[in-house]
């Protein structure tokens, strides 16, 4: 199986690339955001627990997010692996993912891919996306810059986790979409 952690700051094209990688390698993208929305909307036990923390203005503990992920992995069979999007965000989550994959699937993360894009390019892309989509979080340059800073704060420690395992690669996220996909695929194929 090919299990990939996909990193990319807001506006890096991560969602677009994940779709191409899903098709090419028969993978299932697991997005933390999608998992949260499903559990909250459907009032699952984990969704109610997460909501109780959010209602108090607290971050949802790693354990709750990890349990959502574990449940999600059980739902999807018949794929050649997974693309983890938005998880792990901390070293604790990365270590939990290692354990879950080993215990539940007898697998491991093969590679952590990070799309690299200059901050000014990201800001430009997001402002343009904000005009097209009407998303408030993509319309304010100050908010965009804060999101980018927050992204790097959260992912730096996780990148170090995978670098220490020899499972980390950076790919230029600027250029033609097909070229970026080819570069990501070449990195994945080194581990297949």
Residue spans of the language-model regions?
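Glycine-rich phosphate-binding loop of ATP-dependent small-molecule kinases
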Residues: 1-192
């Amino acid at each position: 199986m090919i299990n990939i952690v996909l990193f990319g700051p807001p506006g890096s094209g991560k969602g677009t690339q994940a779709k191409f990688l899903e098709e090419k390698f028969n993978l299932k993208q697991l997005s933390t955001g999608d998992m949260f929305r499903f559990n909250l909307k459907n009032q699952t036990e984990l969704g109610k627990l997460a909501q109780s923390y959010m209602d108090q203005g607290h971050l949802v503990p790693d354990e709750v997010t990890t349990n959502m992920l574990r449940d999600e992995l059980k739902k999807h069979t018949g794929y050649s692996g997974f693309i983890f999007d938005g998880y792990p965000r901390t070293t604790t989550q990365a270590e939990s993912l290692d354990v879950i994959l080993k215990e539940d699937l007898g697998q491991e993360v093969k590679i952590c891919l990070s799309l690299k894009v200059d901050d000014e390019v990201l800001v430009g892309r997001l402002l343009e996306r904000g005009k097209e989509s009407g998303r408030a979080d993509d319309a304010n340059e100050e908010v965009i810059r804060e999101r980018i800073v927050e992204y790097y704060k959260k992912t730096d420690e996780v990148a170090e986790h995978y670098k220490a395992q020899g499972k980390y690669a950076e790919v230029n996220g600027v250029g033609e979409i097909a070229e970026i996909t080819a570069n990501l695929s070449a990195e994945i194929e080194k581990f297949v």
